[in-house]
Swiss-Prot record:
The lineage of its organism: Viruses, Riboviria, Orthornavirae, Kitrinoviricota, Alsuviricetes. It is found in: Host cell junction, Host plasmodesma. This is Movement protein. Keywords: Host cell junction, Transport, Viral movement protein. It comes from Tomato aspermy virus (TAV). Belongs to the cucumovirus movement protein family.
């Protein structure tokens, strides 16, 4: 006979484990820490030459194993209709480049099921980003719920896969990927409509273009260079001198009605970074 019952919350459906036990599995200090350290949830992952392929499960193995036992216990006691499912409504990744835009390279990002030995992209949801396309935001939508089961001693789980291609001559970090998602667990599974991976290119923020005039630019320079900070000696220049010269040029331009003030003065052989990027 099929299981019949009302739709209730997870803790209401089972008495196999106490509410405190379930809460500890999901929200303990260790569980939260491992979501960051093992899964990189909400953290910036650097793509380097020595880490060309990154596979990150969306749930730490320890948490997955504890949840699997929790569901199995309730199922075997006849209190849960299944051994548990994990669902992830959406995975959102913010990708930025950390090398010059003319560097030849790309990233390939997709979701995979660790229960698949080939780790093929789920429903062909793959996003390829050339270095010149960055920054960008990409999103993925799994089209099924992942059963909470063990395969060869490893808990089955969705995983985010990031592959770095090209970037010849760039051995350091070429891109930063910050990913966010919210896994959900239930004794009942969901049905999904097919969905394609999303990709949105992001225009770099031009802070200087939003300033109203020379005085605003001067205030920005002052806040960035911070006259009260200790003097930092560079080859041939000091930050304080650069700031004063920049202000003089801005004042001169302000006195000229047809002068352009929306671009940074080019007075040094080396560029001055004023926007913090």
């Amino acid at each position: 006979m099929a299981f019949s019952g009302t739709s209730r919350t997870l803790t209401q459906q089972s008495s196999a484990a106490s509410t405190d036990e379930l809460h500890n599995i999901l929200f303990s200090r260790r569980a939260i820490q491992e979501m960051a350290t093992k899964c990189d949830l909400g953290r910036h992952h650097w793509m380097r030459a020595d880490n060309a392929v990154c596979v990150r499960p969306l749930v730490p193995e320890t948490t997955s194993n504890l949840l699997t036992r929790w569901f199995v216990s309730g199922y075997e006691a006849g209190e849960l209709p299944s051994k548990g499912y994990m669902s992830v409504p959406q995975v959102l990744c913010a990708v930025t480049r950390t090398v010059t835009s003319d560097a030849e390279g790309s990233l390939r990002i997709y979701l995979a099921d660790l229960g698949d030995k080939e780790r093929a992209p789920i429903d062909a949801q793959v996003v390829s980003l050339h270095n010149r396309d960055l920054p960008a935001i990409v999103s993925f939508h799994p089209t099924y719920d992942c059963p909470m089961e063990q395969l060869n001693g490893v808990g089955r789980c969705f995983a985010l896969v990031i592959e770095r291609c090209g970037y010849i001559g760039h051995n350091g970090t070429t891109a930063s990927v910050c990913s966010n998602w919210q896994p959900k667990f239930s004794s009942k599974n969901n049905n999904y409509k097919p969905a394609a991976a999303g990709k949105t290119l992001v225009l770099p923020y031009d802070r200087l273009s939003e300033l109203s005039g020379p005085s605003a630019v001067a205030r920005l320079l002052k806040s960035q260079l911070n006259m009260s900070a200790s003097r930092i000696q560079l080859p041939g220049y000091v930050f304080n001198v650069r700031y004063v010269v920049s202000l003089r040029i801005l004042r001169n331009r302000q006195s000229q009605p047809n002068a352009r003030v929306d671009s940074e003065p080019q007075v040094f052989s080396k560029p001055v970074v004023v926007n913090g990027i």
